Amino acid sequence: MLFKGIRLAVLLSGMLIFSPMTPAQIVLKHPGWEWRISETGCAEQLIFKNKQRNDTVPFFRKGDHAGPSFYAKREGKEIRAPWIPDGYASYRSEIDGVLCCISYTKVHWQPALRVKLTNESSVPFQPQKAGLKLGIDTYMDKYPDWFGKYFPTLMRNEKTHFYGYLQTPSGHTLGLVSQQPVASWSVDYNLGYQDPAPFWFMGHRIESLNLDLLNALPLPSRHPQDLYELKQGESKEWTFLFINVGKLDNLEYAITQAADIPLIDIRQTSYAAHEEASFMLTADTPEVKVTNDAGAELPVVLTKAEGKRWIGKVKLEDAGLYTLSVRSGNKVAEAVWTVHHPWQWVMKKARENVARYHQKPTSHAESWYGFYSAFLAARYFPDKTLDKQLSDYFDQLYNKLHDPEKVEPLYFKTRIQNTSTTIGMLADKYEAQGNLEDLKKASKLADWMIRTSQRDDGAYYNHGTVYTSVIYIAKSVLELAVLERKQGEQDPFWKDCAERHFLSAKKAIDQLVASQGDFQTEGELTFEDGMISCSALQIGMMGVLEKDAETRKYYTDAMLKILNSHDCLTQLRVPDGRRRQGTMRYWEAQYDVQMLPNMFNSPHGWSGWRAYATYYAYLLTGDEKWLEQTFNAMGAFANLIDYKTGQLRWAFVVDPHLEVKQACSADTKLNFSDLSFGNPHPKLYDTRKFVIGEQYVNMISDWQTVNTQDNDVHELFKCIGETVLTNAFVIERPNGEVVGYNCRVSGKGNTLTVKADEKQIVNLHCNLKQPFSVTFGGKSRSLPKGYCDWAFGQSGY
């Protein structure tokens, strides 16, 4: 019995300590952690105690997002019920005759939450959603506070259980697992602004992570399909463990130590046709099968490793999706590999889709982003008729948006990302066609932008806001400078241009480095995917271009610090090749495909920004993890083109159950080639309601005439063109194994023969610990011990 004003603590080895700080506040203590619970029954903070430092998981302390709290959604409205004390560290609440009981406790030495739902009403309970608003503080609104906030990076529902993790930009990972099936999950996205009133656009922040214990159908087939209701008198129970994972590399080990669930670990999620895929599995007695999308099984070799770990191998077939299914006892798990078509096929199909989905002259460069794909494909795989059609239309669009004499934008001049994007397109057009007039236009546009929009400290800006990392202003200028340097070998005019533009970009990138993570971006400030990834990639590109070892290391270190902080926004562990390496953007659908509300679009066109950065990280460090991440990303990107039909999709939506509204009627006042400015709200048009979840979303620029930005998906094919389309990589691993990416490697002794997977792959990068003689493309070179650089050809920079 606890008496008012008296603290009671019982300490036994490994036991939980209950310590009331006030009559209403409770602190649950354990040698490794401490959980503080407020007088409302919601958590205040969860502190994990480590030898070097403590890691604190903050919870919202007041308002609608405090939690854990019981909530239900029905008829489009959410109800949140307050807790009533129901025993020590236990609480209850009720909605519509459904009783929810929770207890804060310990399971397997981990802080845990036991949850029980009981339908005490006289009718079935069939909400749209019902469960817990978890309450962990996910609201990233200012620097440097956001380094301690938790982003909901991965939530994974299997038919028999649930797991996932949240991660901070500073690198701490919080695992979450339940051995009971959970219907679904969702997040609450904030509202942004009205334009025009009364219509709302969504914001750039996340207010809550919700564990939806019950959820209406449809749900993805991998989810439990029977948790859409609670019958009269029925009860269901769940236990959620909160696991101090620490570094993300510990995720699978930490989860399997605390929960008896089969866990699939696939480090490479994308392959070329007929390659052998491997996976690691933690399970007791697994039954494993791999099927293609027609349901045919492929032979799997499963080998027992240490403890409960198993290593599996399977030879995949033609382009498509391959599902790995695991059963261990009464638990099941699933993973997906992608096998991509040759990169040549991908780029040709991307170009075809540039013509299918209209490129539109608007206030936003995203609406004509497809010209990147058009000019890259034209450079490597000429198609006289289609290339002329697209080139002529680009010229028409360019002339509508620019003053031909002054060579500067006619509209929205402060949206300098439009200008830098046009510079990049003109550079690619020049490389495809060899017309020096395109390079001259790009050079003059760069001069205009630098003159009007670069501060003394180097930052490119828009009305006082640093815009260097809105898309990637400096990278586009560097792409131009690289081409000007080549021309400058014969012409001093171009040499001067190259030097001027290179120094401008360098100043801008040095300002990013000096910002120490305190970056700025377009729109509502948050720890924003593109702001972080574009800063990392531009610093990385500068490092690649630098020849001085000390300067190169300076940029490398700065880039890696930023790139590592971006991990929390990236799907680095999801066992699904369609999504792997996608970045977790969530406010683009309203602008790109006129769909509301917010949703995780991953991969989305802007996922390409991180992939440039991981590519540069590999070139600068030789660490294979960055190359693996790059190729996983390219596989996910390639799969946005339907491998059966060649049709381009806009993005993959991660949320498992979303009730959306999408515009379904075209604007009748404008044609595709007419100027269109601003972001027309979806509700200005006829809309339809429907449910989506874990699926691709189609493009709309084939029918919507006004400004939409779904063509930003072409950033992914630009990224493919710059990183893997013409490049192969050979790596000697620490154990002496030599592997190839985009190539096949055979060897005898200290001799390696490398055969490219495709004929346009003419550059070979070698990362070797021992000296080797390497043959590639009919040529041979002797490479010294520790060689890590381009051995044949060059990267393009």
Regions found by a protein language model. Name each.
Residues M1-V10:
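Bacterial N-terminal signal peptides that target proteins for export
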Residues F18-S19:
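N-terminal signal peptide c-region/cleavage motif recognized by signal peptidases
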Residues P23-Y193, E234, T239, R744-A756, ...:
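Beta-strand-rich N-terminal accessory domains
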Residues F147-E229, G295-P299, P771-V774, R781-P784, ...:
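Trp/Gly-enriched beta-strand surface patches
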Residues R267-E275, S363-H364:
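Short, solvent-exposed loop/linker segments at the N-terminal edge
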Residues A273-T285, V754-A756, L764-C766:
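Aromatic/hydrophobic beta-strand junction motif of beta-rich domains
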Residues V288-V290, D318-N330, Y797:
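Short, aromatic- and glycine-rich surface loops/edge beta-strands on solvent-exposed regions
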Residues I311-E317, T323, V332-P771, G777-S780, ...:
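Glycan-recognition and catalytic cores of secretory/periplasmic carbohydrate-active enzymes
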